[in-house]
Structure formats: structure tokens, C-alpha cells
């Protein structure tokens, strides 16, 4: 559930292993990802990164800016996988700003960062990332994007009366165009729908 950067990135990879259905409560280009104007931070490979930058420095910057709210193992994993994620996005067609002469990425430095490591696509970075991911998802075999499907609840064994274990078996969604409730059965359900305050 969710057609932003997290949901589509996961769905594209998961579709290599089986059928994937992505539910979006609205149009796929209306995700929070598409509205993001800032850049995306990554320590790029040697030769492309700001001299002296590295993953340890990015981790330290993130932990410092996070004021004790970040989990270091999670931060380290995200930072260390950042360059591969940027590579995926560029292979999917995302166009980040580049130096005219050399063709390398234009790297910006923003608050909380000790080095230039922010990639932009003009002032619509999120929209460009979303565009590339949506296009890639639509071209991916085994992947179906369903817009205007609002998830109502998860289907669980507990709700079906099973007492021994409580597992997720799928989701109930409202198809807005028809007003009908639909049931989606699934071996795995991934919640990638933004803030989890009401989960």
C-alpha cells in the first residue's frame, strides 16, 4: 500500500519474484513523494562525490541533526545503500541536475550536512523521482498499479476468527470509482503509505 518512493521502489524489486499489486488512495502522481521539493542526499561513489565525504560523515551528520531520535543501524543502512538507490533512479530515467561541462551531478549542501551531497532536479526533485518510478512500475511485468483504491483495513486471521496466530492475509480497499469494497488476498502486505500515526 502506497505509491510513493518507498512503495514503488519495493514493488519494482518484488515484481522480479512474483505478482505485485500497488494500491494508491489517489492518483499515483499525487503522492507525498511527488510534492517534495527538496533534494535527495547520498554519498556517491569515488570520483562523483564531494572530496573528503564518506558514509561515516553522512551518518554522523544525520545522527547529529536527528537530535537523538535516529537509530544508528537504520541510518547507516540507508546511507550505505544510498548510492545504489540513486543509480536505480537514474537507470529508471530520473534526471538530476548535472554540471554542463563534465556531466557529473550538481551537488548541493543543505542544513545539517557537512559536505555537498544533495542531488536536485531543479526545484521539483520529488516529482521527477515519482515520474521515473511510476514509468518504471508501469513497464514492469507482474506489477499492477491501482489508483483511487483507499485501504480500509487489513485482512487478518484474528478478524476471521483464528485464535492460534494473528497473521495478515491481505487488505480491504474501497474502489472510489465504483464505491465497491474490494478484497485483496496476499502472501505479504507492505505498508508504505507515509506517516503511521493512525496505524
Predicted regions and their residues:
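Glycine-rich loop(s) and the adjacent beta-strand/alpha-helix scaffold that form part
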Residues: 188-199
